[in-house]
Amino acid sequence: MSITPSFSRRSVVSLLAAGAFSSMSAFAQFRVEVSGVGMTQLPIAIAPFRGEAQSPQKIGSIVKADLERSGMFRGVDAGGVVADENTRPDLASWRQKGADAMVTGSVSPLADGRFDVRLRLWDVVREQDLGGQSYTVTKSDLRLSAHRVSDFVYEKLTGEKGIFSTRIAYVTKAGQRYTLWVADSDGESAQSALASPEPIISPAWSPSGAQLAYVSFESRKPVIYSHDVATGKRRLLANFRGSNSAPAWSPDGSQLVATLSQAGGSQIYSIGLNGGDPKRLTQSSSIDTEPAFSPDGRLIYFVSDRGGSPQIYRMSPAGGNAERVTFTGSYNISPVVSPDGRWLAYVSRVGGGFKLHVMELSTGTVTSITDTSADESPSFAPNSRLIVYATQQQGKEALMTTTLDGKIKARLSGAGGDIREPDWGPFQR
């Protein structure tokens, strides 16, 4: 049985046959809407920062949205109380209001046009000062400073690194124009990386966060390029005979794996970044595509219909025998492994729809975590706690984030638009 054209948005067959993008107008900026109820969330009060009323960015509001979106925190209404980092709040009264932690701070303009952002974190239960931070930033980096505040608070209270100052990449289509965007993890501050009248698909961050690999159709066939995020320069990575699609970086950034059809059928190859012939890794007569490395580089997960329907397999990075991974459901695609190596996210066809699933790799336990039916392109946050994915909600294209149990979701899309192919970048170095 061959794989149908709906096999994957990352596959070339899908893009050509299914018309992956609609004609709706695209929105590059996002509105975060958090839904769901978590039972183990830490209640935290984030008071409006002193001076933020005159600031271009409302730091306290951004921090509150970040922490709630993580699924680890529940905001406690600060009641409009403004408090800075130098004033000790009445922690006993905040405890009575239900808060276990509290953030206070200030944002002040400097004479040179920059801003001074300061915060202090309080343990309300123990009535302790947990420390603070300060950031001197330009006006354009005020939102980034708010995300760094969120990172500080998250790490102090959970012991894990925060992901709020990381970035996501995604693709939009407006009319006949395709654009690759790089944005904050909440979807704001989006910057156009490149635009084209021809389709752009499959953006993939390099492990360093300096490069984005992607597939362009500007040559009337799929070709893989890398885009330098800092300079905007691009480099040709794969333009072999036939199609070149579904790029994925090795964890050390030394090579790509991709789907090539230079020998006829779609097979997986490794590609050196310094040229040379690609090395064929799969040797089947079926369609093999959508490769994804495990974080330790010891395995490559991929999709194949060699068993009669699309399923997820894994193999050594040197190729050879493949082991089937998915057995629940007759149609499973778009595998991605969490950075901690514990989880496999993928999309499964259920009753005619496509839903995001998560498998615990140590046990094989599978959980469906969405109630939408057009999910695609999952990508893990670098701390493995959240997944960003594309879907349709109430008839509109959307980017969503979800916790791994599916309880807390945040819609990152605006009122409408064609927004696809999200990929979550690594921690900033």
Curated annotation (Swiss-Prot):
Keywords: Cell cycle, Cell division, Periplasm, Signal. The gene is tolB. Residues 1-28 form the signal peptide. Part of the Tol-Pal system, which plays a role in outer membrane invagination during cell division and is important for maintaining outer membrane integrity. The keyword Nucleotide-binding does not apply. InterPro entries: 6-blade_b-propeller_TolB-like (IPR011042), PD40 (IPR011659), Tol-Pal_TolB (IPR014167), TolB_N (IPR007195). The Tol-Pal system is composed of five core proteins: the inner membrane proteins TolA, TolQ and TolR, the periplasmic protein TolB and the outer membrane protein Pal. They form a network linking the inner and outer membranes and the peptidoglycan layer. It comes from Polaromonas naphthalenivorans (strain CJ2). This is Tol-Pal system protein TolB. It is found in: Periplasm.
